[in-house]
Amino acid sequence: MKENCYTYLNFPISHLKLIDAAQPMTTYNNFLDWCKHKETISPNAKHTVEILLQISDTSECDRANELLSNTTELNLKNLQITDISPLSSFAQLTNLILGSNQISNLAPLQSLTNLKTLVVDVNQISDISPLSSLINLSILVLDTNQISDISPLAALTNLTALVLFDNKISDITPVQALTNLNALILYNNQISDIAPLRSLTALDTLYLYNNKISDITPLASLKNLKTLFLFGNEISDLTPLASLTNLNKLVLFQNKISDISPLTSLTNLIELNLGNNQISDISPLKSLTNLTELYLFNNPISDSSALQALNNLFLLDLYNNQISDISSLQSLQKLTTLDLRGNPIVNKICPVNPESICRF
């Protein structure tokens, strides 16, 4: 899941030798000074300087400074970096990748105001206030940290993609100002109130799964949404989704849903997941003829006849329902996977060919 959120952020990186680190004690205004004093600075800072020298493929500070001062992209992912102070003078950087390190202090980044992409996922960050000055950011990835206060992000109105999953966020009020967002990834947090999302009408991708959401009324205004993940919440009323007619992918499993009639209008859906709910009447799905994947596992469904119109289905998951008659599924000739396990089927003959498609 995580890779799908920002696989486009990959940059090449050298295979670098790693060095032990500790806390910074001295500061300098530019990389050249950091480098020339690398034998007297803290082990943490020295480690970062050594990495930058290796990326530059030189041991000469002047040459490395010249090269690094002219590069616009740096990938420092997974290099055991703790102290990023030696980066503070590289104001020309537009893309900076710092994922999978041990960074807790982002203060050295506050002067890098030309950054358009910043990735600092899987670190030890709780305070993101230094980022408030980075107003040119378009893509910001901060997942898998210890962030609870996202108020510094309110100033970053040029953001088009914001990734904050696996944090400790409950209040998302600051995002209401980020009206240029196309993608917002907030799963695995502690969010219950999504009212601030109402203004984000440019969103086409929204991940909110595994939170504490019950009221999805604010989503009704997000008419450009194409992908919406809401599984693992406390949702029962789907009415606000009726207006989201551009949706292609909707994932709602593990909620408290029984009435799916609001989904009737979502005729552009290609993938729909309604597993682990309390749905018995699936007749509203008749109109969703563009569906290629439909997941209805773990529901109290007994009548599957409404599915016979969905003849574009490649995958149909009916695992663990109460279906006894599957003859109506014989019209689904494009199926490549049909999961019927856990149903009281009387005549266990696969309704489509070949029989290997069916799982009983």
Task: List each language-model region with its residue ranges.
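Per-repeat structural element of leucine-rich repeats
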Residues: 82-83, 104-106, 124-128, 148-150, ...
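Ankyrin-repeat and related helical/solenoid repeat scaffolds used for protein-protein interactions
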Residues: 275, 287-342
